[in-house]
Regions:
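Terminal accessory/anchoring regions of large secretory-pathway or extracellular enzymes
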Residues: 60-95, 99-104, 122, 362-568
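N-terminal signal peptide c-region/cleavage motif recognized by signal peptidases
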Residues: 52-54
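Acidic, contiguous internal or C-terminal segments within carbohydrate-active enzymes
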Residues: 247-293
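A contiguous, surface-exposed recognition patch within enzymatic or periplasmic domains that forms
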Residues: 96, 189, 283, 287-419, ...
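Solvent-exposed N-terminal domain segments of exported/luminal and surface proteins
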Residues: 75-219
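Extended, loop-rich substrate-binding clefts of extracytoplasmic carbohydrate-active enzymes
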Residues: 209-264, 385-397, 401-402
Length: 568
């Protein structure tokens, strides 16, 4: 794997990345603001609505292959934006007015049948001005689900006489018995452009996925946001544990067809098959893209004036190379700086955007529950032989902006007019599968006392618990045989000292036990690797790595990969 990182040291206020960040935040407001906090039950209030009587929808043959053919045909023609009209009244709704429109959960698709899944619909308005077409698929036949105002409680809204009904829904979410047998919890949301989010059991929503990204994080290049414009919801069987959905992707530069096979549970798995055709060249095509938030963590300098020690949806990128080696890159944001790291990889086994710190004490936020935010693992299946994994970190003013982008750019680039097929799996989970290695748990930086020209880095490695070890894995009871190995890519940097200490021993400050869901009464043994280096005064950044090795030189930990900059 090769790595290239670049930074823009100019203030963000004058940089193109501001537009990118605001665009992402605007799209994600659709999910944060409209879809995630509906009440479980609401009284039905009477209101007078004026809408055209929906006509009967005729069933049509449907298959994913036919949808792929439709997408290819669309890609061969000039882009035509969907012509779904939304009246000004709905467009001009305020946040509170739009939030007051509630979907009646007992009227959801399949809800009255008491089956394994039901579907809620989102009402367009406020920032959710784009609409999508929904179809139900039964027995290979699809039927359009026309907009129905009777499915919503409009609260105190006074809808002007003659206001046309919307011609589509803003999005949808799926429910199942995820946490308890007596309530249908939401576990999946599609809303806004090609954004979607999922959660495993006992977790709140966190980072967002997308179907596709175009030109994300490229300075001076406008980002394009293709839309899932049509969805085909396949009716599940009575005892089904899987929900299957197909979607049509449309955009100025691309058309495509997606099939999602979703299995909710302690680990919610979203299997994705996509056929994509470019209608014109793009600078960067992003597969399996994610948007997340990292405001500040234990290594952030200076920290915002906030009562919480850390605020983030994700705190690290874990990359499993084709060789099986694991590299861990902590997330970080620096005031006024834009960071873009590119990892060139061949046949990667997986990569994950993790929320690894599970201690409530690290966040102190009983409402946002950052210690319980889900992690996501991407497992390539087809079409990921060679490419670049892009990690883009942008400054943010607060926790409402998603400022972290992760995407896979396939190599070679897709050719215009040629259809490419990709298959990958997303695992939305609480904790990653144990590797049997020491794992990076925390990164901190500073300067030694009275030595401001030097840099002190500490990396905490957690020993795998015995229950996590496979047959034949070493238990590492004697840590004296381990040593940290540090590399610095700049030859001008002087490495002064390297050390390793056990900070879980009684005679040193132990890490506190976590207070989050699922935390045990004990912590794994934690070793703290540390090193001091002296960069030249004019050096603005350093690429650093650290890993633990045994006496034979065998690597026994993840490799910590870090980009240090002078403002830290």
């Amino acid at each position: 794997m090769t790595t290239v990182c670049r930074e823009n040291l100019a203030p963000v206020s004058g940089h193109e990345s501001v537009d990118i960040r605001q665009a992402i935040a605007k799209r994600l407001q659709l999910c944060h603001g409209s879809g995630m906090h509906f009440h479980r039950s609401l009284p039905l209030l009477g209101c007078v609505l004026f809408a055209a009587t929906p006509g009967l929808s005729l069933a049509e043959d449907f298959s994913f292959d036919a949808l792929c053919a439709k997408a290819r045909k669309m890609a061969a023609a000039p882009y035509a934006a969907p012509k779904l009209e939304l009246a000004d009244f709905w467009k001009n709704l305020t946040y509170d007015q739009h939030r007051d429109i509630r979907f009646q959960m007992d009227s959801g698709l399949w809800a009255k049948e008491k089956g394994p899944f039901s579907i809620d619909f989102f009402h367009p308005g406020w920032t959710a001005k784009k609409m999508v077409l929904l179809h139900e698929v039964k027995g290979g036949k699809s039927t359009a689900l026309k907009f129905d105002q009777g499915l919503f409680n409009y609260g105190k809204q006074k809808i002007p006489a003659g206001t046309p009904s919307p011609q589509g829904y803003a999005g949808w979410r799926a429910r199942t018995h995820l946490n308890t047998a007596d309530y249908m919890d939401e576990f999946l949301v599609f809303m806004g452009a090609s954004y979607f989010r999922a959660i495993p059991k006992d977790a709140p929503y966190g980072l967002s996925a997308r179907g596709l990204s175009i030109n994300s994080g490229l300075p001076g290049v406008g980002e394009e946001f293709p839309d899932f414009s049509e969805f085909y919801l396949e009716k599940p069987g009575k005892d089904a544990d899987v929900l299957r959905v197909s979607a049509l992707l449309t955009g100025e530069s691309v058309a495509g067809a997606y099939q999602f096979t979703i299995t909710p549970g302690p680990e919610t798995v979203v299997d994705v098959v996509a056929e994509i055709t470019l209608r014109r060249p793009v600078r960067q095509l992003g597969l399996a893209p994610f948007s997340s938030m990292f405001w500040f963590g234990e290594s952030t300098h200076p920290k915002p004036y906030d009562f919480r020690p850390e605020v983030h949806d994700s705190d690290g990128l874990l990359m499993e190379l084709g060789s099986g080696n694991l590299h861990y890159r902590p997330l970080e944001t620096t005031k006024g700086q834009f960071r873009h790291c590119v990892f060139t990889m061949e046949k990667p086994r997986s990569w994950s955007l993790l929320q690894r710190d599970r201690s409530f004490l690290s966040y102190q936020d009983p409402e946002a529950l950052y210690h319980n935010r889900p992690s996501v693992r991407v497992e390539p299946v087809e079409g990921f032989d060679l490419g670049k994994l892009h990690l883009i970190e942008m400054p943010t003013r607060d926790e409402t902006d998603d400022n972290v982008i992760l995407l896979w750019e396939p190599q070679p680039a897709l050719e215009v007019g040629k259809t490419a097929r990709f298959h990958y799996r997303l695992r939305w989970m609480r904790d990653p599968v144990p590797s049997g290695l020491f794992t990076v748990r925390a990164t901190r930086s500073g300067t030694p006392v009275q030595l401001p020209d030097q840099v002190l880095m500490t990396i905490d490695f957690a020993k795998p618990l015995e229950a996590e070890l496979k047959v034949g894995d070493p238990k590492w009871d004697d840590i004296s045989k381990l040593k940290p190995v540090v590399t610095i890519n700049q030859q001008s940097v002087e490495l002064i000292h390297v050390g390793l200490t056990d900070i879980s021993m009684p005679n040193v400050d132990a890490l506190p036990a976590g207070l989050g869901r699922g935390d045990k009464l004990h912590m794994p043994q934690v070793l703290r690797a540390f090193f001091v280096c002296k960069p030249p005064a004019d050096l603005t950044n350093m690429d650093l790595t650290c890993e633990l090795q045994d006496e034979t030189g065998k690597v026994v930990s993840e490799r910590w990969v870090y980009l240090w900059n002078k403002t830290q």
